[in-house]
């Protein structure tokens, strides 16, 4: 797990006002306040538990036309974002979803799998010098990582509805029904569990769910 160093806040010192402004912009434009991505075989093409080596920048695969890192290498395996993921992050980086923020909810199996995933996020890019990790950090205070819930080591678990999402709710201060969750798990229904178990008391609603869109 990436432990949150600070509670959910915006980039400058006037965090409460910025949080309110961000939420207002999201509401005005009909966007969720928090867009949450599963990672393995959803955001990108690989399962981190099957890999054994941390991704190093010296091994990156760079697209010669765009000078952008399109592949992070773990051993002999290349980790690539799905085109839908790349498009979503690019549009977000370009400011097409004002007020929304990004997060991850990934139940990577082992501490090593978590580290490999984190290294892939640091190396993969949507534009020259713009890493996926840096896009996930947009809108949050420097050093805040409470939006990046990766792994299943306590307090996380394999059950995202019981751990990942309650932790995201706590550290981002964003209500469940104002979240959108992308997950295409084919061995269990994380989406249904999150939608039914993570319900905001006053609204009576859980996160909106989207299956498999990341592959488009």
Language model segments and positions:
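Surface-exposed intrinsically disordered loops and tails
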Residues: 146-152
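Short glycine/proline-centered loop/turn elements that form peptide/ligand docking sites
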Residues: 186-189, 204-212
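Short, well-ordered alpha-helical microsegments
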Residues: 113-114, 165, 188-191
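Conserved small/polar residues in nucleotide/adenosyl-binding loops
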Residues: 214-216
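Asparagine/serine/threonine-enriched low-complexity, disordered tracts
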Residues: 13-17
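Alpha-helical substrate-recognition element adjacent to the catalytic core
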Residues: 3-9, 19-145
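Acidic, divalent-metal-coordinating active-site segment for phosphoryl/phosphodiester hydrolysis
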Residues: 183-199
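Conserved Lys-Pro-Asp/Glu-containing loop-to-beta segment of HAD-superfamily phosphomonoesterases
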Residues: 161-187
């Amino acid at each position: 797990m990436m432990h949150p160093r600070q509670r959910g806040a915006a980039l400058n010192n006037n965090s409460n006002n910025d949080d309110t402004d961000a939420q207002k912009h999201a509401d005005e434009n009909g966007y969720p306040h928090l867009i949450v991505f599963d990672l393995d075989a959803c955001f990108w093409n690989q399962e981190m538990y099957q890999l054994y080596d941390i991704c190093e920048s010296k091994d990156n695969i760079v697209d010669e036309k765009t000078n952008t890192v399109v592949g992070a290498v773990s051993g002999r395996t290349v980790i690539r974002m799905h085109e839908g993921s790349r498009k979503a992050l690019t549009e977000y980086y370009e400011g097409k979803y004002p007020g929304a923020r990004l997060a991850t909810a990934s139940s990577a199996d082992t501490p090593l799998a978590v580290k490999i995933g984190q290294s892939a996020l640091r190396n993969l890019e949507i534009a020259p010098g713009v890493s996926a990790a840096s896009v996930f950090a947009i809108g949050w205070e420097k050093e805040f990582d409470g939006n990046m819930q990766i792994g299943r080591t306590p307090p996380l678990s394999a059950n995202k509805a019981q751990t990942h999402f309650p932790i995201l709710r706590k550290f981002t201060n964003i209500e469940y029904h104002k979240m959108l969750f992308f997950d295409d798990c084919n061995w269990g229904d994380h989406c249904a569990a999150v939608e039914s178990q993570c319900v905001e008391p006053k609204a009576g609603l859980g996160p909106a769910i989207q299956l498999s869109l990341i592959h488009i």
